[in-house]
Amino acid sequence: MLYALLLLFGGVSTVSSLRVAVVGEGVIGLSTATAILDLAEKRNIPAPEIHIFHHKPFEKILSRHIAGLFRIDSGSEIDRKYGYDTFEKLATLWREYGGLSGVQLVSGHILSDSKTKLDSQRESYGSLVYNYRDLAEPELFGPTSLFDLPRNTTTRGIHYTAYTSEGLRFCPFLKKELMTKGVRFTQRRIGNLEELGAEFDVVVNSAGLLGGVLAGDDAGNMKPIRGVLIRVDAPWQKHFLYRDFSTITIPVIDHVYMGTVKQEGAFGPNNVTSADIQDITSRYVALQPSFKRVHMLSSFVGYRPGRKQVRVEKQIRETNGSKKFTVVHNYGHSGNGFTLGYGSAVHAAHIVLDLPLDAYHGLVPEPLPINATISEWVKYLDD
């Protein structure tokens, strides 16, 4: 709370001298910079200088290719807090900008043979999204139903309304807003956090899958989760549809995403294969036969930053020149980056601005044990 106290008692005339580097131009890095500026404005604190570093062009990063449907995988208390704060931000953007922000209001259905899995959805976010309910039998079974499922099946379903925040539009929107507020962007590979510590007071690590490697103490707690999405031309598809969380379509503003695979620990192949296409399309067409007639526009393979829990932590480090600086980690969102991203960014922003963390007391889990082991996947995916 040093900055806040000094500001209160007149020891610092502004906080604009605080220099913040953010590593990562994906949804987490952009959201963190946005949250820092949002929180500074809300608390009437002069905004710090922010500089975002990224080593890949936007077209090649995971966030560029994500549909971004709001859905919380884990029902942990901290994830529900992050989800709530993200949902509030998405609702604000939808009201003010609509689709210009990349945010879209959409309804849809999730089907599963597991009642436990469906019940966990209600626990995780049922009270947060709009219109959450169980699907009735007439919606599931019979010739006038949505799905015409056989009556002897154990399949059940839920319906809800929420937001998508498609990376193709949402991330450029955030970047444009940040640039109008003076945030700088530089394409440059950062080898270690100390490299930036000499120049900045705070370094935010939002490096996604490579966040653990960059941290220097967490590489072994990260794992890639290979995923594939196919972008298709199906303008009549207005509702998202999931079957057991891996067979999906998500409509966004002007096209539909179909997927997916979730291959934990896989670090190849780095291209979409014919086997990927066959696997995804055959599963989805069995769910919704009309999709055998859609046209594929593009496809993408990416690696979700798998971790047992999101890492939002503060460290005090020292450069080789003995200059102390603050590190704030914000990575490890697995497949929930667009759902938890702004919420975890608000948490990180509180740390960056040295503000009280009362809202997070009792919610944040114990940190994972230090594990700096560099796994084989790093040399294949660190390009």
UniProtKB/Swiss-Prot annotation:
KW GTP-binding (keyword) present: no
Cofactor needs: FAD
Keywords: FAD, Flavoprotein, Glycoprotein, Oxidoreductase, Secreted, Signal
Residues glycosylated per entry: 152, 271, 320, 371
Consequence of gene loss (knockout): Mutant worms have high D-Glu content at both egg and young adult stages and a high L-Trp level at young adult stage but do not show any change in physical appearance. They also have decreased egg-laying capacity at 20 degrees Celsius, and decreased hatching rate and smaller brood size at 25 degrees Celsius. Mutant worms also show delay in growth to adulthood and an extended life span. Impairs the nose-touch response. Does not decrease male fertility.
InterPro entries: D-amino_acid_oxidase_CS, DAO, FAD-dep_OxRdtase
Tissue: In both sexes, present in coelomocytes (at protein level). Expressed in hypodermal cells and the proximal gonadal sheath cells in adult hermaphrodites (at protein level). Also expressed in probable head mesodermal cells and unidentified cells in the head, and vulval muscles in adult hermaphrodites. Expressed in the seminal vesicle, spicule and tail cells in adult males (at protein level).
Highest taxon of source: Eukaryota
Protein's UniProt keywords contain Calcium: no
Catalytic reaction annotation: D-aspartate + O2 + H2O = oxaloacetate + H2O2 + NH4(+); D-glutamate + O2 + H2O = H2O2 + 2-oxoglutarate + NH4(+)
One term under GO cellular component: extracellular region
Residues the entry annotates as binding FAD: 56, 63, 339
EC number assigned by the record: 1.4.3.1
GO biological process: D-amino acid catabolic process
Pfam family, one: DAO
Molecular-function annotations in GO: D-amino-acid oxidase activity; D-aspartate oxidase activity; D-glutamate oxidase activity; FAD binding
Subcellular location: Secreted
Signal peptide residues on this chain, from the entry's feature table: 1-17
Stated role: Selectively catalyzes the oxidative deamination of acidic amino acids. Plays a role in the egg-laying events and maturation processes of the reproductive organs.
Annotated family: Belongs to the DAMOX/DASOX family.
Protein name stated in the entry: D-aspartate oxidase 3
Origin species: Caenorhabditis elegans
Taxonomy of the source species: Eukaryota, Metazoa, Ecdysozoa, Nematoda, Chromadorea
Name of the gene encoding the protein in the UniProt record: ddo-3
